[in-house]
Design a protein with these regions (language model features):
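GST-like fold's C-terminal all-alpha helical module
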Residues: 103-194, 199
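GST-like domain detector, emphasizing the conserved glutathione-binding G-site
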Residues: 1-129
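Short, solvent-exposed turn/loop segments enriched in Gly/Ser/Thr/Pro and often Arg
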Residues: 40, 162, 203-204
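Alpha-helix termini
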Residues: 44, 69, 119, 170, ...
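A generic structural-conservation signal
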Residues: 36, 87, 158, 199-200
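Terminal-tail/helix-coil boundary detector
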Residues: 199-217
Length: 217
C-alpha cells in the first residue's frame, strides 16, 4: 500500500496547510488508498528519514521499492495513474504539467516569501522593511495569474487537472493576497471538490490536539 509521511502535530496556524495535504488530495482524486507514517518532533532529522528525504520535509511517498519526495514530483507520479489529474491527450497532459510547475516555480516562492515575513519574522526590522515590497511582488504575480485564468473555471478550461490541485493549494497559503474575485472563486471551486474535503479531514484527524512534550534537559 502507498504510505506517505506527515507530522503528528503542528501549530494551529499550519493545520490544513502542511504539504502532505497536496498528496492526500491527489490520492483521493485518483481513488488510491494510502496510509500515513506520522512523524514526532525530531523524527524528520534522523539519519534514516534524511536518507529518504534529504531536506527533512514532509511528505515522502513510498510504494514498494519506490520512494519520492517533493509534492510536485509526487502529484505528477500519481497523475500517471489517474486521468482525473493528468489527461491522456498529450497536449492537455503537457499543459496540466505546465501549471503544476508554474504553481511551484512562478507563484509559490513569492507567496511563501510573504508568509515567512508575516508569520515568523513580523517583528524584525528587516521584515518590516521588506513586507510591502514582498506583498506587491506577489500581488503582481497573482494579477498575471488571474488574467491567465480569465473567465475559465479551471486553468486549462472546463477540466480540473493536477495543475489546478497544485495552484489552489498554493493560493490557500495567504488568502488575503487574492484580491481578484476570479482567483477567490477559482480556489473556492477547486476546494469544493469532495476529494479535497476528504484529504483535509484526514490531515486534520491525524494531528494530535496537544503540543509535543519538551525533551528532558
Amino acid at each position: 500500500m502507498i504510505t506517505i509521511s506527515a507530522f503528528a502535530w503542528v501549530p494551529s496556524f499550519a493545520r490544513g496547510q502542511v504539504r502532505d495535504l497536496r498528496v492526500r488530495w491527489a490520492l483521493e482524486e485518483a481513488g488510491l488508498p494510502y496510509r500515513t507514517r506520522l512523524l514526532e518532533q525530531g523524527d524528520q532529522d534522523t539519519a534514516e528519514y534524511r536518507e529518504l528525504q534529504p531536506f527533512g520535509q514532509v511528505p515522502i511517498f513510498q510504494e514498494g521499492d519506490l520512494t519520492l519526495f517533493e509534492t510536485g514530483a509526487i502529484v505528477l507520479h500519481i497523475g500517471e495513474r489517474a486521468e482525473a489529474l493528468l489527461p491522456k491527450e498529450p497536449a492537455a497532459r503537457a499543459r496540466a504539467t505546465q501549471w503544476v510547475v508554474a504553481a511551484l516555480n512562478s507563484i509559490e516562492p513569492h507567496i511563501m516569501n510573504v508568509a515567512l515575513i508575516e508569520v515568523f519574522y513580523a517583528d524584525q526590522e528587516w521584515a518590516k522593511l521588506r513586507r510591502a515590497g514582498a506583498r506587491e511582488f506577489a500581488a503582481n504575480r497573482l494579477r498575471s495569474l488571474a488574467n491567465a485564468l480569465g473567465d475559465k473555471p479551471y486553468l486549462d478550461g472546463d477540466r480540473f487537472t493536477a495543475g489546478d490541485l497544485m495552484m489552489s493549494t498554493v493560493l490557500r497559503i495567504i488568502p488575503d493576497l487574492m484580491t481578484d474575485v476570479r482567483l477567490q472563486d477559482y480556489v473556492a471551486r477547486c476546494t469544493a471538490r469532495p476529494a479535497f474535503g476528504r484529504a483535509l479531514d484526514a490531515q486534520l484527524a491525524d494531528f494530535r490536539p496537544d503540543a509535543p512534550a519538551e525533551p528532558a534537559p
